Amino acid sequence: MRRRQLSCAALLTALAAAGLTGCSGSTERPADAHGTTPAAPPTAAPSRPPAPEPEGPVTSPSHSPPPTRPAASPSPSTAVWKPRPGLSWQWQLDGKVDTSADVPVYDIDGFENSAADVARLHRAGRKVICYVNVGAWENFRPDRDAFPHSVLGKPNGWAGERWLDIRQLTVLRPIMERRFDMCRDKGFDAVEPDLVEGYGNDTGFPLTARDQLRYNRMIASLAHARGLSVGLKNDLPQIPQLVAHFDFAVNEECAQYDECAALSPFIAAGKAVFHVEYTEPRSGFCAESRRLRLSSMVKKPELGVWRSPC
């Protein structure tokens, strides 16, 4: 499990820029699942990310001009998988995949699992999602040296990880292209890009909601160009702007924070919402999850094999 936090001071700065005052939230909020053990959980007081800026013509910062190289086009015969609401799933990011869960969808680590692992799941009739961190540098990944120092920000609270400067599209795009190539070449059906709401955290960079929208749309286009479907991880405030670009959603703890209704645009569009709770008992949220048609379960924070579905 990954914890995403936004300090009260950082939020006040963002709100002041918008002519607002106040700071909400008083308990630490868990965030993206990762499958590694943090050196220490973040201690900053959480709050909601700043409200997304309205859509409109976007220009890249002067230090990071938009890429001019077009994305590769998928094969005309490639059909992007469109998971429907209500599908059961397994989310295992801790180690090599265990295939014992009898569910149609598996979400597993793209680096730690092989093409043979994916093929074994396919033979059992499963669809397989490739977990990839696109918002933070990880010193334990084989491509760690591909990231220049200029894009590395503050530590994000997890051992060996630092936030990325997502404004530098021309630097990050080819790295993410290679990662998504890996997912495609291993036979994955989809991508789960992690940490796509850095703008709501103290990253060390002055990231805005508009920067995040630009980056997230680029990530979605890279996946689609490779015939992969792509899920929006958390980032609830930007769902209205991004639901058309993503094929499903992955959410952590919307029930605990009474936010699950914010995911309704995905369900209304016929797109699955894969949802997990870590501390809430099933009796406290499963009825509402069924009403909203979410694919919900309880998992332990380390995201191993154990699961308790609604």
What are these model-predicted stretches?
Residues 4, 85-91, 250-259, 267, ...:
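C-terminal active-site rim and adjoining tail of enzyme catalytic domains
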Residues 1-21:
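Sec-dependent bacterial lipoprotein signal peptides
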Residues 109-114, 235-236, 254-256, 279:
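Short beta->alpha connector loops
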Residues 76-167:
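N-terminal carbohydrate-binding/catalytic regions of secreted carbohydrate-active enzymes
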